[in-house]
C-alpha cells in the first residue's frame, strides 16, 4: 500500500486517481458528514476512523451501498482495542446472566483531545448497555500526553472483573487503519469481479472474523 496523497479539501482530489485509491478518513464529524457522499461517489473504497456521525450510520451505509463503494468503519483501529471490545462483549453477556454486576468505564487521553468521552468509550459502553440492560457510567480524564487508556470494569458484591488496554503511541491506530485499507481494497476487487460481498463492515467484525 502506498500513500497517493493527502488533502485538506477532498473535493480537490483528482477523480481519476481517486477511483484507484482507498480513502482513509480521520477528520471530524462535521467534515465527514459534509464529505461522505463525495467519498462514496469517487473513491474505490473507504476506511472511516472519524467518530461522532453514528446517528446517521444507516443513511451513510445505504449511500455507500447505493454507490457500490466498500466502507469499513470503526471508532478505533488498534488491534488490541478490537480484541478488548470482543472480550468485553463476551464478558458483559455472561455477567448479565449471572446478575449483580455494575459496569463502568474510565478512559484517559492526552490533554489535546477534544471529545469526551472518546469514541472508543462510547462504542464499548453501547455494547455493555445492550448486553446488560444497564447504564454504564463513563469517566473521562485528559492529562499530559497519554496516547490512550481504556478500562472497563464490572463491580460485583464479591469481586471485580477488569479489562484494560493502554496504547503506548498512535502507531497502533495507524497500522490497524492500513490493515483495514487492504481489506477494503480486497472487498472492492471482489465486488468488481461480481462476487456477492457485504460492502459496509465494522472493522472489528472483519478483523476477528465475526
Which sequence ranges carry the predicted segments?
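C-terminal substrate-binding/catalytic lobe of Rossmann-fold NAD(P)-dependent oxidoreductases
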Residues: 1-16, 99-210
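N-terminal glycine-/serine-/threonine-rich beta1-alpha1-beta2 phosphate-ribose binding loop
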Residues: 1-41
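Rossmann-fold NAD(P)-binding glycine/threonine-rich loop
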Residues: 30-41, 49-93
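Short, well-ordered coil/turn residues at beta-beta hairpins
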Residues: 26, 49-50, 156
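Residue-level detector of anion-binding/catalytic polar loops
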Residues: 22, 45, 70
Amino acid at each position: 500500500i502506498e500513500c497517493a496523497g493527502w488533502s485538506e479539501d477532498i473535493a480537490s482530489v483528482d477523480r481519476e486517481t481517486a477511483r484507484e485509491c482507498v480513502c482513509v478518513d480521520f477528520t471530524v464529524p462535521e467534515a465527514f458528514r459534509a464529505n461522505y457522499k463525495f467519498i462514496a461517489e469517487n473513491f474505490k473504497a473507504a476506511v472511516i476512523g472519524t467518530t461522532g456521525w453514528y446517528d446517521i450510520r444507516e443513511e451513510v451505509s445505504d449511500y455507500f451501498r447505493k454507490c457500490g463503494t466498500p466502507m469499513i468503519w470503526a471508532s478505533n483501529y488498534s488491534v488490541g482495542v478490537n480484541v478488548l471490545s470482543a472480550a468485553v462483549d463476551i464478558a458483559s453477556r455472561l455477567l448479565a446472566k449471572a446478575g449483580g454486576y455494575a459496569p463502568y468505564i474510565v478512559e484517559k487521553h492526552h490533554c489535546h483531545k477534544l471529545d469526551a468521552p472518546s469514541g472508543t468509550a462510547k462504542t464499548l459502553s453501547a455494547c455493555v448497555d445492550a448486553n446488560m440492560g444497564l447504564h454504564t457510567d463513563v469517566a473521562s480524564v485528559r492529562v499530559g500526553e497519554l496516547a490512550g487508556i481504556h478500562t472497563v470494569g464490572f463491580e460485583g458484591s464479591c469481586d471485580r472483573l477488569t479489562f484494560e488496554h493502554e496504547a503506548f503511541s498512535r502507531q497502533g491506530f495507524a497500522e490497524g487503519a492500513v490493515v483495514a485499507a487492504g481489506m477494503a481494497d480486497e472487498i472492492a476487487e471482489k465486488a468488481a469481479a461480481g462476487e456477492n460481498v457485504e460492502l459496509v463492515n465494522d472493522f472489528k467484525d472483519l478483523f476477528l472474523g465475526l
